């Protein structure tokens, strides 16, 4: 069986189920586990993800307004070595390749298309089972799911009765956008009070005044596609928001930059690590570190002058 994974989280699931030898195509973003980087790349992005947050947002908006796709498929590879199974997603046309990106290239291709559409943590676990069923690895999938469920329950038990803090998670910085889908649920499970998006609902542009009115005690920066270092660096733009510097979380240094790709944006097994990261941030007295040093960065000082006008950046340091 030849499998194309057009979703980084699906690639992680396939490798976790021991199916790496059957994966013959992955996306340009599939970088975990490290071995995935050696698989043939069968997609391309038409948006420059190296640009700053506002520029990326502008590119995406412009392409949508023109009816243009954000991603493309290597049609030559599809014809030369067609897969038997294609795994894709239909949850977010911005985050990853979706069926509309390759629908026009499927003529003559008899591959079975498996579309994943998770909204909550339990949906992600069901996706693991779904991939296991499709690939003949149902038993391995169930074993993986049970292991993840045990870790989720361990966090809940550890934090039972713990005081809850108001949390604002930002999955984009400019414009600021609160985390959606499974992120609010993760905040709740990690002992926090989630922000303006209901669990299971997609992220959307929320007026800054509405987010500011939540008076968050903790702010977690988790931009899609950003490392903690990049999130920390580009967070300088937030100091230009009205009232940002006066927020309790900012004044007390309770602003954290985390690895969005690894632990929050991709609906795969590592979301459970993300839950453990949130639990560590919100309740360091109860939760020990579970990820390498540098996975969480904590605000130490704001930009010079309190804004980006001086071209300085806020300073973050590893959170032990």
Enumerate the predicted regions with their spans.
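N-terminal ligand-binding lobe of clamshell/alpha-beta domains
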Residues: 1-320
């Amino acid at each position: 069986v030849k499998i194309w994974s057009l979703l980084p989280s699906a690639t992680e699931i396939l490798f976790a189920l021991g199916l790496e030898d059957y994966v013959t195509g992955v996306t340009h973003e599939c970088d975990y586990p490290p071995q995935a980087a050696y698989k043939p790349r069968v997609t391309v992005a038409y948006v420059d993800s190296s640009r700053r947050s506002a520029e990326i947002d502008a590119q995406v908006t412009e392409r949508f307004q023109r009816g243009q796709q954000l991603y493309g498929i290597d049609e030559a590879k599809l014809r030369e070595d067609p897969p038997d199974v294609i795994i894709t997603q239909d949850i977010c046309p911005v985050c990853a390749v979706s069926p509309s990106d390759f629908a026009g290239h499927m003529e003559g291709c008899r591959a079975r298309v498996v579309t994943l559409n998770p909204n909550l943590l339990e949906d992600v676990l069901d996706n693991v089972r779904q991939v296991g069923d499709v690939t003949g690895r149902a038993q391995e999938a169930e074993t993986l799911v049970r292991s993840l469920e045990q870790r989720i329950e361990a966090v809940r038990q550890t934090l039972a009765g713990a005081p809850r803090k108001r949390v604002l998670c930002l999955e984009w910085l400019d414009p600021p956008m609160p985390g959606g889908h499974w992120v609010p649920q993760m905040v709740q499970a990690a002992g926090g009070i989630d922000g303006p998006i209901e669990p299971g609902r997609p992220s959307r542009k929320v007026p800054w005044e509405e987010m500011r009115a939540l008076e968050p005690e903790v702010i977690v920066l988790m931009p899609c596609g950003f490392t903690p270092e990049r999130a920390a660096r580009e967070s300088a733009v937030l100091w230009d928001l009205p009232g940002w510097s006066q927020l309790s979380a900012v004044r007390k240094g309770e602003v954290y930059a985390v690895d969005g790709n690894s632990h929050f944006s991709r609906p795969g097994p590592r979301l459970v690590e993300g839950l453990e990261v949130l639990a560590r941030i919100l309740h360091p007295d109860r939760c020990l570190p579970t990820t390498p040093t540098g996975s969480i960065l904590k605000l130490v000082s704001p930009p010079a002058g309190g804004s980006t006008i001086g071209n300085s950046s806020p300073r973050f340091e590893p959170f032990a």
